[in-house]
Amino acid sequence: MKLDLDFELTKTDKLLRKFEDIHNFIYANDGLSTQQTLEEFIKILFVKIIDEKKKEKKFYIDDGEFEKIKNSKESEKFTQRINNLFSKTIQEYSDLFDNEDRIKLSPLALANTINKLQDFSLINSSNDAKGLAFQKFLSHQEKDGRGQFFTPEAIIDFCVSILQPKPNESIIDPACGSGGFLNSSLNFILKNNKGVDIEKIISKNLYGFDINKSIARIAKMKLLLEVNVETNIRCVNSLKDYDEVLLKVKSDNTLNGFDIVLTNPPFGTAGKISDKKILSTFDLGYKWKKTINNEFIKTNTLQNGQVTEILFIERCIDLLKEGGRMGIVLPNGHFENASLEYLRYYIKQRTKILGIVNLPQETFIPYGTGVKTSLLFIQKDTKNVERRYPLFFSQIRKIGYQGNKNGNAIYQKDENGEILRDKNKNPILDEDLSTVINDFKEF
């Protein structure tokens, strides 16, 4: 058994090195930014998957073509072959690509990429190896100044463990980014349930929307590497017309809404939504007035602008079915500021608050922001607005990594300064996330 595990890890490391080598070659030779380099690499992975579905393989470069390009000469046959494949990719994934999209790699970078990947199958190789390699590859990019704001894996896994998704439950992230919450939910379900149909879960139960096509492609690729089935990752502005959003998720399993919403909506420097057409479709797009009974009523006056994450709160509650559960990352000010008392009233009117968990300031520093945040867990419950119930509240103090740009892991140590290890000899992270999860279960 140990030999199989070592072999699997070896395959993962080799594939990770291959991905990194390709990325570094493009970055060094083509003058693209690191984010642009990642985008081009993802395009090629989609092209390869399309080719692997065909009987006649076109994703290759022969020795003569490669030598020609390395000697600064063109190989029109090779370039045309790959461009034709990309055209088929655009047709297959029209929700993630535009007709005007092109592969923006130089002939040499494209040739090197195809050469590195042509003898490897994305569809038929081990899901564990390729999925883990791609996840490690992405985590390197996310922590290395790639310009995008992602959610730390530790926080994602924590939220999923709190809500404990089940195999038959529908899950959506309306601001999915690279798909972290969806992949973590999938892994949680597979780990805690035997004989689960992974294809059914991915094709029927997992949904992710993102306004950014490049980021949505990453989320889709992560699920495609788990199993090659139709996925429900879409490039959608989740704050636009609600009926339009619902059309994107219409299925037997989501007719009455979703069982679980997990999301980290854009906030901080994202600015405000000022489009009156969008604001008018949200209760929280209007101004609210406090009554003499310390309640709030919505007025007929639109806000001049509303921050994105507040509109996302309403949209997420809308997406839930009655009794559905939600976990969302929010700035601490939403729980404290007097000017947002109406928001807290709105949430309490439509949901039961399951818990609030405060995160340390350093949580998101390795991922691009120092905004203090908390996690809000709620259950949609519109029928019992007049009720009192105990509220779980906790504060995370140790997250298992440093609060700096690198976000290096921090491990538990004994009195001699030696790193503590578990029964499998793995170093034990210095964190209290797992303690809070157990506290919540016992609450």
Task: Name each model-derived stretch.
Residues F25-N29, K48, K116-S121, H140-D144, ...:
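Alpha-helix C-capping/helix-to-loop hinge sites
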Residues K43-S139:
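Long recognition/docking surfaces used for binding and targeting
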Residues F25, A129-A154, V160-L163:
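Class I SAM-dependent transferase core
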Residues M1-E56:
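Accessory nucleic-acid engagement/destabilization modules that flank
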Residues E20, Q35-V47, A111, N127, ...:
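Non-catalytic, well-ordered alpha-helical scaffold segments
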Residues Q148-T263, G268-I273, L330-G333, A338, ...:
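Conserved S-adenosyl-L-methionine
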Residues Q35, I103, I123, N127, ...:
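Conserved phosphate/pyrophosphate-binding and hydrolysis machinery centered on Walker-type P-loop NTPases
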Residues M1-D4, K248, N253-F443:
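A conserved structural/catalytic subdomain of Rossmann-like adenosyl-cofactor enzymes
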